[in-house]
Regions:
Chain B
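Short amphipathic
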Residues: 7-14
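A general secondary-structure signal for short beta-strands and their flanking turns/coil
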Residues: 6, 35, 70-72
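Haloarchaeal acidic low-complexity proteome signature biased toward cell-envelope/secretome components but also
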Residues: 1-7
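Generic signature of intrinsically disordered, low-complexity segments enriched in small/polar residues
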Residues: 8, 57, 76-79
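C-terminal edge-of-domain segments
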Residues: 62, 67-81
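Amphipathic, hydrophobic secondary-structure cores in small proteins
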Residues: 13, 19-68
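Preference for bulky hydrophobic residues occupying beta-strand positions
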Residues: 11, 40, 75-77
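Generic intrinsically disordered, low-complexity segments enriched for polar/acidic and small residues
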Residues: 2, 51, 70-73
Length: 190, 81
């Protein structure tokens, strides 16, 4: 019994020291988290390669870069077309499958109609001084946006990596994308 | 307090549309010295809201003034640090 009292006193002082250490530990990790939070991140998965669908990921990526975000755009399936230096300049607009198109689907399905609707869209982009896909991609690269090309779909769809824009990251897969998304403040699938 | 300030640089993005006014403003402000003021001229009506949002979400910049002058939208942004 008599030994209990001093040991209990020891325990208490130990506890206090431990608490102090714990508080310091927690303060450190809070400071780390706050430092981490200062750097905002956005992660976009780009899966489409039509002219209209190539715009949203690039507009958001360049704008987020202007906000000082760390931005990663992971391109997979048809999204790889956006990274292809030549083909990104000639992305097509589909004249079918979109009920908001000025032509009915049966007309849109006539051979050559995709070319017509694409030309119309390109003219509007030009008349409106809207940035081109190439311009947006190069601007984003200059601003430090990381463009990644999914390795599995590069091989599946038989892309030549040398034909991508300079600065595109290859040799990445779903786990890289997932890790980016887990870390990001904003995650989008386009 | 007087609203007067000296303009350090002017960025003319007349005719350009989203997202270029914001993107080019960011690139231009990077070259403005601390305490300097960037004047940005745009014809994009969306720039009034976009530049305001960008300035609020970006460290080291302060939106001093926005002026709507017919089809021209003028923005004055100070580089704070």
């Amino acid at each position: 019994m008599s030994t209990d009292t001093p040991s209990a006193g020891d325990d208490e002082s130990m506890t206090e020291a431990q608490l102090q250490a714990r508080i310091e530990e927690l303060e450190e990790s809070v400071a780390e988290l706050e430092a981490d939070d200062d750097q905002k991140k956005m992660s976009i998965i780009a899966t489409k390669g039509t002219l209209d669908m190539a715009y949203p990921p690039l507009i958001l990526a360049s704008t987020a870069a202007a906000f000082g975000y760390d931005v990663t755009v992971f391109h997979t399936f048809w999204g790889l077309e956006i990274l292809h230096e030549e083909r990104s300049k000639n992305l097509k607009l589909s004249s079918v499958g979109n009920p908001n198109m000025p032509v009915p689907n049966v007309v849109g399905a006539i051979p050559g109609m995709d070319r017509v609707t694409t030309k119309m869209m390109e003219k509007r982009i030009d008349d409106n001084d809207t940035a081109t896909i190439q311009e947006l991609l190069e601007t984003s690269l200059d601003m430090g946006v990381e463009f990644q090309a999914c390795q599995m779909t590069i091989e599946l769809m038989d892309y030549d990596e040398a034909e991508f824009y300079d600065g595109v990251t290859t040799g990445v897969g779903a786990a890289t994308a997932l890790e980016d998304m887990a870390d990001a403040d904003i995650q989008l699938l386009v | 307090m007087s609203e007067a300030f000296d303009i350090t640089e002017t960025l003319d993005v007349k005719g350009e549309s989203c997202p270029m006014p914001v993107v080019k403003t960011k690139n231009a402000i990077d070259d403005v010295p601390e305490g300097g003021v960037l004047e940005m001229l745009s014809t994009d009506s969306g720039s009034m809201s976009d530049i305001n949002g960008w300035a609020q979400g970006t460290d080291g910049v302060e939106l001093l003034k926005q002026v709507e002058d017919g089809d021209l939208y003028k923005h004055y942004i100070e580089k704070t640090d």
